[in-house]
Amino acid sequence: MTNIPQPLEPTPHESYALFYETVNIGEQLGHLEYRVTEEMLHKYCSTVEYWQSGYVNLAIREFHQVLSNKYGHINLTSCSRNDYYYRPPIIDRRVQVSGWIRDKYISDGIQYLVVGTLAIDDIGTEILKTQETFSLGINPPLHQSIADVESQPIQQLPALEKRIEKHTWNLFKHFNSEFEIGDLEPMTEQETGNLLAFTYAHELLTETYGMNFLKGGLLNVVFCNSLLPDQTCTISAEVNRISEISERTRTDLKILVKRQDDVLAASGKATILIPSPIT
């Protein structure tokens, strides 16, 4: 009797290529729902020592969740994140997050996905619109910056220094599972460090601009090298441009997040309108 050979398991590269061909630009990814509890918000804010945020969404991997709801677990590397803030979520309201594939492309042989999400609460209040770019697989950092344009700064904001304690690191790594939000595996070390870098950039802008940033602010960050636990990092920002738009002042900034070894962890740009266009 002839033994019929078993088909070979696809290599990771082949699996990513198959997945990349499967997804379509504009494809809807379904929804994620969760309730914002006082315990959830308190634990998030107290752990990162950042009480003004209100956006517990920053610790919830909404974009990962809507993608895995449809396609299961996929190894992804965060490359950049672009947030537009409407209003911080209100305690005890349910949040519904819808997701879709905004774009996909190949660069230097690596496949990229752009996932968009929109979070609203149970009475239709818009909370947060996010666009996240991922490379498929576990890949090295991009080693590029979106904040490297040479320009003479108008103003330098006071720098923010943060100590990354282990309990802060672990909270972000396991936040979804601790509060039973969706069904995701814990974040990788790289993803945890990237998300903390984004959160700290958000904190610096909130400390400076308050509700003018939390309602109507735009933050766009590229991840370069992950932050590390049990270390400090420094977040700096400088104002590059101030202009007048329809009786509002528009402020454009450049942001850098650096590790204690002076390695660039993330760089970004932000835009704030004063007064905020969102009431």
Role assignments for model-derived ranges:
Residues 2-79, 139-218, 277-279:
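Hot-dog-fold acyl-thioester-processing enzymes
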Residues 2-24, 86-167, 229-279:
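HotDog/MaoC-like acyl-thioester-processing domains
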Residues 16, 79-86, 100-101, 218-224:
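Short structured motifs
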Residues 33, 225-227:
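Structured beta->alpha junctions
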Residues 70-76, 86-89, 227:
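Long amphipathic N-terminal alpha/beta scaffold segment
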